[in-house]
Amino acid sequence: MLSIIVPTLDEAEGIAAALAALAPLRARGAEVIVADGGSADGTAVLALPHAERVLAAPRGRARQMNAGAAAARGDALLFLNAYTRLPADADRLVGAALARGAQWGRFDVAIAGRHPLLPLIAGLMNLRSRLTGIATGDQAIFVARAAFEAAGGFADIPLMEDIDFSRRLRRLARPACLRAKAVTSGRRWERHGVLRTVLLMWALRLRYFFGAPPDKLARLYGYAPRER
């Protein structure tokens, strides 16, 4: 079984549509688990009709995804941002990749939006990921449960949890880099400026690779999880 784990925090505006898009996968046997980090806008209530389980999880993306994985029944796990849409046959593609011997992988990403640079940025993200074996959350990382447990799950850090997880998984095996596209929202790129966002993300990533603490990077990014 494929378990799709969706961490949420104040996603009321789009969560129903995001989860409704997963209905065909659920009809084919996948389960959807929403791990909510204490939304104040009713996200958890809106998610209830569209998921097998809606969990109240400790706030923080890594904590929420680990909580979802602990509750999941599947032998394959897929971690999906609430603002990212999977390919229609994602369940079959993941199953085929794991059946071929992959231990983990990710999809190519497309960035939805009107800015002409977004397709180029997505293409470079996919190329970089294919060359380095590192995936980001926007690429809908999937993993066999045994590999998830062998890697130790997500580290309890407020930012770069996807990069850290990929690095540990890469020690087990190279990822299956699927060319089918997960489509992620370009809202943060367009809201803050495409070039500015690219430069900020690369600066944060370089600092992380050179040892900067993730909590400091989270503050620079403008993200600091509130305590529950």
Regions flagged by a language model, labelled:
Residues M1-S3, E31, D164:
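Cell-envelope/extracellular polymer assembly enzymes that use nucleotide-activated donors
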Residues A30-I33, A44-A71:
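Conserved donor nucleotide-binding strand/loop of the catalytic core
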Residues A20-G29:
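Short, acidic, metal-binding catalytic loop of nucleotide-sugar glycosyltransferases
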Residues R167-R228:
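Hydrophobic helical membrane-anchoring modules
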Residues L77:
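Short aromatic/hydrophobic "clamp" motif used to bind/position activated sugar donors
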Residues A21, D36-A44, T84:
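A conserved acidic beta->alpha catalytic loop
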Residues A88-L117:
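Conserved donor NDP-sugar-binding/catalytic core segment of glycosyltransferases
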Residues E13-A17, S39-H50:
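Acidic helix N-cap motif at the loop->helix transition within catalytic regions
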